[in-house]
Amino acid sequence: MSKMRVYEYAKKHNVPSKDVIHKLKEMNIEVNNHMTMLEADVVEKLDHQYRVNSEKKAEKKTEKPKRPTPAKAADFADEEMFEDKKETAKAKPAKKKGAVKGKETKKTEAQQQEKKLFQAAKKKGKGPMKGKKQAAPASKQAQQPAKKEKELPKKITFEGSLTVAELAKKLGREPSEIIKKLFMLGVMATINQDLDKDAIELICSDYGVEVEEKVTIDETNFETIEIVDAPEDLVERPPVVTIMGHVDHGKTTLLDAIRHSKVTEQEAGGITQHIGAYQVTVNGKKITFLDTPGHEAFTTMRARGAQVTDIVILVVAADDGVMPQTVEAINHAKAANVPIIVAINKMDKPEANPDRVMQELMEYNLVPEEWGGDTIFCKLSAKTQDGIDHLLEMILLVSEMEELKANPNRRALGTVIEAKLDKGRGPVATLLVQAGTLKVGDPIVVGTTYGRVRAMVNDSGRRVKEAGPSMPVEITGLHDVPQAGDRFMVFEDEKKARQIGEARAQRQLQEQRSVKTRVSLDDLFEQIKQGEMKELNLIVKADVQGSVEALVAALQKIDIEGVRVKIIHAAVGAITESDILLATTSNAIVIGFNVRPDTNAKRAAESENVDIRLHRIIYNVIEEIEAAMKGMLDPEYEEKVIGQAEVRQTFKVSKVGTIAGCYVTDGKITRDSKVRLIRQGIVVYEGEIDSLKRYKDDVREVAQGYECGVTIKNFNDIKEGDVIEAYIMQEVARA
């Protein structure tokens, strides 16, 4: 018998290498690992051991003696085996002394090894059973019938795409079968490769299985999601009314007269600086008012107000008529397809002329009902409160005609009216609920931020637990200040709200980056043309988001030739040290609107010489910036002739050129002035003086009545009788 390694022997007898190593160690044969080479006699001993074990297994199978316990049965079998061995050994006669002695020695060794083996088997309870355990799986496999193929499903659904493995699992087939079918269709695919819709449909049609693709709604873009409510779920909701009109025509005063509060007195300069939302009750029915500022710089906010509104009240002063901002308001309302009620205010004034107002508004297709049109006109006085009841009745009448309804029994959806950063409460947002009911504790996504509604306050300053459709509320609990005009939506849990909020913020960041880096050829040409244009860098900080947007829009509208406004940063809150550092690095001016710099910011501004401009009225901001931009422009110059000299004689000097011997006839000739050479009334050359001398000395200027020597830079064609005219470019103030 030849030599073999441990693992080869184990493989031959279908036993683990560990068992073979264990047996060899019990036989006092040193083995290191499964690669150890076994001698022929060692292999023979191992064969003998495994043969004995298999015989014992066979005996146990046929006899099956009654055993009180497995341990006792093992003892009994061991003793019986040893007795048989002894008897056999005694019965055999000795042929030769030497041979007998050798055989006895061999037998004694074998018996000792067997005894050790069985003792180990007793302790472990494993020895004689190993062969049985190894042999069992083969018989089981032989008995098992072939696997039946799963029945094909009638229909499968998928979302987006499926891998080959996923499709095979859904169809109850092996991936190799799917890969084969794809190969036959000309598609080379691996088990983890994504399949498109066409490939999935081809495979499924081959098996006769229907395919349905699930359409997933991207909730991160919830502004575009339209949820259609059942008609029976809809209930009547209050109308949302926006008051629009020209500055100082009495919008805020009218709203105050309606809700009996004095908002105008709190506003700087008597002009509303940001949107406020209020709710009033009239004849048992509620009306929500949005006060959109009338100054034209707030065009962005007014457009946003028209998007959330149901009815527009166009306030026109009876003594002033239609103004530019009145026309703007009409255009915004028409663009939003919102019905207009015209309120002719200031009827208490003696110079009031409502007919003129109605005549002017007819040019914009606002024809009064009394003149055969369909626009409601209300004559009133906000100051004396005359005609206000009639206006409110008209609002309710129009809202009934519009059939304004919403479903309150769903997750809330709406728009941010205003947002600000409060020192004590953190980010605060005024929300207008447009559908559903907003409750305290709701997980909410607002624009690109998220949070949980911690507290809700109505327009009266009272805490409320829920807000239904068309109700404005101020909420806290957001992680950041949203943008005015952002949409909000309530989600089922805070985890999902956080994921969607973060995803929206990330998407917005990517969009901003792509806008900054994307350049078309047209833009590139424009930038090249604007290469010499100066930029005025600004950092804008304001008390509320609406004011920030309004200031940015107003400043960017300023058009001074040669200067471009660049808003480096615009945000809500006080002016901080980080704003000053940003201004330092970008060479910017900081504008604060209704905010002040903190102590650290003041100190940093003083040390870095950063210009901070603080204002409370928007007109002043625009005027001051315009003035600054005019100062930054390249100054305008005008030509001023300072003297004339007549060429009396010329001298040609090598390495110097032509020297003109002149006599100053008028004014003076200076060394730094520009000159033009005039010959017979025609300008021959314009340039600069190279040298100016009187006798042999260089002089700064030569006055009238004196002679001098002049050389003109890069020009030598000077003749007697020519006139040298000296002039300077003088800076003049820009108009």
UniProtKB/Swiss-Prot annotation:
> Region Disordered: start and end of each range?
52-154
Keyword Transmembrane (UniProt): no
Gene for this chain: infB
Which residues lie in Basic and acidic residues bias regions?
52-66, 101-117
Q: Which UniProt keywords apply?
A: Cytoplasm, GTP-binding, Initiation factor, Nucleotide-binding, Protein biosynthesis
Annotated residues for binding of GTP: 245-252, 291-295, 345-348
Q: Where is the sequence biased in composition, kind Low complexity?
A: 134-145
Q: Ranges for the tr-type G domain?
A: 236-405
Note the InterPro entries from the entry: EF-G-like_DII, EFTu-like_2, IF2_II, IF2_N, P-loop_NTPase, Small_GTP-bd, T_Tr_GTP-bd_dom, TF_IF2_bacterial-like
Q: Which PROSITE patterns match?
A: G_TR_2 (PS51722), IF2 (PS01176)
Q: What does this protein do?
A: One of the essential components for the initiation of protein synthesis. Protects formylmethionyl-tRNA from spontaneous hydrolysis and promotes its binding to the 30S ribosomal subunits. Also involved in the hydrolysis of GTP during the formation of the 70S ribosomal complex.
Keyword S-adenosyl-L-methionine carried by entry: no
Biased composition regions of type Basic residues, renumbered to the chain: 121-133
Show the segment(s) annotated as G3. Answer: 291-294
Species this protein is from: Geobacillus thermodenitrificans (strain NG80-2)
Q: Which family does it belong to?
A: Belongs to the TRAFAC class translation factor GTPase superfamily. Classic translation factor GTPase family. IF-2 subfamily.
Q: Which HAMAP family match?
A: IF_2_B (MF_00100_B)
One Pfam family hit: EF-G_D2
Q: Where is this region: G2?
A: 270-274
Residue ranges, annotated region (G5): 381-383
Task: Write down what this protein is called.
Answer: Translation initiation factor IF-2
Highest taxon of source: Bacteria
Provide the residue span(s) of the region labelled G4.
Answer: 345-348
What's any one GO cellular component for it? Answer: cytosol
